[in-house]
Amino acid sequence: MLNFTDVTEFILLGLTSRREWQVLFFIIFLVVYIITMVGNIGMMVLIKVSPQLNNPMYFFLSHLSFVDVWFSSNVTPKMLENLLSDKKTITYAGCLVQCFFFIALVHVEIFILAAMAFDRYMAIGNPLLYGSKMSRVVCIRLITFPYIYGFLTSLAATLWTYGLYFCGKIEINHFYCADPPLIKMACAGTFVKEYTMIILAGINFTYSLTVIIISYLFILIAILRMRSAEGRQKAFSTCGSHLTAVIIFYGTLIFMYLRRPTEESVEQGKMVAVFYTTVIPMLNPMIYSLRNKDVKKAMMKVISRSC
């Protein structure tokens, strides 16, 4: 008979047990977190105050920045606290909350990226109908679905996490409460959780990625039909930022969640998780601003008005 324990908290093993590395990581991730907050909040404010950015593309981008703020804030503050603390713990309730928001925000982000791909197709493939087809009402509907679906999916996934049983050590080999190390640590109730995690991740990633791939196939066809070299260059420039963000985000998530949790995969996943929980939210504003002339112009106007 299994010796189940009434878990009240978990120990987060984090990235390293060496004190000198912990201090270094604290400084690095604090700087990354500050840049993430400034970049994403700055992007939201810029889109809000700039009339030239008042179109569907930047409407979706503002929501992507909003999700990245919460995505990073769900993990980073607790990680920073534990890097300097001798007691590297998280309560059971705190762990479930972290799991809930993490899964919800991942699903919201992948479907926002899909909506952005569809928006780019409408702008490039049907420019004359773009204004009527991508109206404010349509954009609100497209952005509402990811939030509702993401949070409902996360609620179900978190309830399955709640059904896990733990015995013996309650050490999570990670720097936040992630599903793979929790499943690896559990001693019962893992079957449903493990396979629903893989199936749900597979279905949602496949569906959203299919929308993106189909949208880009139509975009490519539309670009090849363009007679103007300048038009082609502008279209490629517009899509390049989004495509870069898609490849980085999906690549890391697929590596993390579409494999059965093993000791090796959990250890590898921990390194990958650093990238998509801290680095990607920091990079997104840079990706979308450095390669976007409209954002640069809007930024210069705001700076010139404030000087």
Curated annotation (Swiss-Prot):
The protein's matches in Pfam families, at most eight in alphabetical order, are given as:
7tm_4 (PF13853)
Which superkingdom?
A: Eukaryota
Please tell me one Gene Ontology term that the record gives under cellular component: plasma membrane
Entry's transmembrane regions: 24-44, 53-73, 98-118, 138-158, 195-215, 236-256, 270-290
Q: Give the location in the cell.
A: Cell membrane
User: What keyword terms does UniProt attach to this protein?
Assistant: Cell membrane, Disulfide bond, G-protein coupled receptor, Glycoprotein, Membrane, Olfaction, Receptor, Sensory transduction, Transducer, Transmembrane, Transmembrane helix
Q: How does it sit in the membrane?
A: Multi-pass membrane protein
The UniProt similarity line reads: Belongs to the G-protein coupled receptor 1 family.
Q: What is this protein identified as?
A: Olfactory receptor 5M3
Which gene specifies this protein's sequence?
Answer: OR5M3
